[in-house]
Amino acid sequence: DVEVELGVDFFANREELEKSADKVVFTGMIDQYFDYKHGELEYRSLRFEHEVLDEENYQGNAVVNYTEREIPYTRIIEHKHFEYGTQPKTVITREYPADWKRGDEPYYPINDEKNNAMFAKYQEEATKNDKVIFCGRLADYKYYDMHVVIERALEVVEKEFTK
């Protein structure tokens, strides 16, 4: 049996959780797992602004990306288009890039030379721990598109369960 617990602070319950299973899947920040012993990896974060508009359609698509330097946000999401909604109003969300600091949501790793070298040290630590499966964008310190996430999950399952 596989037990899944959601909404649990791993670090507040770490000892209990690690004792509760033969293997633990850790998808959080790898540097945090190792108590930042090699330094703090850097991320980019995001900030969101939501707005209800008194119109049926704002942009005609669920997601429109903006790459122009003069436009401060990187995309607008019009939620009703994910479900082909026909409501008389619409809700949009503007996504803005933001600097990351500890405690913020880490969205994108900053894969420069310094961070990659630091991550390699954490990765080496992770290989010494056969009780924990490190995977996911934060544990792998890598941005993943959805199809790659699925591929990575299948690789981890194959490695862990076909021994």
Give residue ranges: language-model regions:
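Helical element adjacent to the flavin cofactor pocket in flavoenzyme catalytic cores
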Residues: D1-K37
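C-terminal segments that line or cap access tunnels to active or ligand-binding sites in enzymes
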Residues: A21, Y33-K163
